[in-house]
Amino acid sequence: TVDFEEKVCRADKNCHNECKLKIYRFGDRKSIWGGDCGRYEARHLEGQSQENYFKEREKIFQDYLFQGENILELKQEASSGAPVIGVPMALHSLEWAIFWAHIFSNLGYQVRLTPPTDQRMVSLGLKAMTAETCFPVKVFHGHVSYLLHKADYLFLPNPINIPTPVKEERGVFCPMVESSQYLVRAALDLPDQKLIRPNIFLREGPKDAVIRLQEALPVELRPKGRELDRAVHAAWQQQMDFRQALLQRGRQILQEHDPEQPLWVVSGRPYNLYDDRLNLKLGRHLAKLGIKALPQDFLHYEQETLEDFPRMYWGLGSRILRVAKMIARNPNWYGVHLTNFSCGPDSFLEHFYAYVLRHKPALILELDEHSAVAGILTRIEAYNNVVKNLQQYQYGAAPETVAEEKLVQAG
């Protein structure tokens, strides 16, 4: 006999997704479906677990982020009469929030951050949209909407570019990230007097940021003398220290790794790579499946050259191609690229990514708000079989199946 029931998942008290589970019982066996996170669907695939380096990257990020004295999560109450500056933890903030938050913390203001993306924020973002965009931009709208009445000011910069290893590179963000402040301001009808919205050229370093912030800060928030200069430079150093901590840990991981064993290297844009809702907890699933997977931030990709791509002006695109070159050069490294539907730059970049890898297979996971964990796990399982066959073939064992060396395209 088959018994069936439905109930709301309560496995994680901190999860607000309210997933409606479908539970089937076949005698002594039980099968559970319907969860957004894949907690139940992945169980039959699990092997000897590996370290979750996505979680480790998040811990390092949080450690550096919350070293400021006045940086609050949303549930914390403001502790003084100082103005509260809201920073939405989406898009560029998934990498640069340390810099953003510490500027205002160093000035003595309180900084309120949004919590990790959940279904409530996704719903708020979708409701606020006035045009079709990629999923990360929709989520950004949700974070801003969630924060709107919980801070005195909202910090919504227009980040134009990022630091580049070579001064000739332009390193620009995609237009959606550059203009995210304009999009959300129009969609939510935000009052100008509540916004701090400087144009920030991160490629130019902290000196330029001081000038831009001085122009953008409301008069009542502008510090006297060189206070802003000191605050920005200290915040910049904190951001750079975070990068160095990742590189140091990455070197340690690679030194301990057996070079004859496969290593999956996961590339992508920080705002989907390090948001558990956008990546569907990819790091956790890979670790539970026994797959050693390293996100790109642990790699010293800056040392790679892009002389064969002289006109690559996307900053994050250049980073992804540098990571691809490292994957191509190391025999037992395998590439996983995480992207989104409706991502204009990635629609071009994926071809260059495959070109750089040449003979190596890669897994491209293309996600949006409609993606489900079960489909992603199927793609991962298929790609894992390809990797195993290639490893067997490379080290002399007869593979179960001769794997075609082609790009595994996620549907």
Set out the residue ranges of the language-model regions.
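An N-terminal assembly and electron-transfer interface module characteristic of large anaerobic redox
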Residues: 1-411
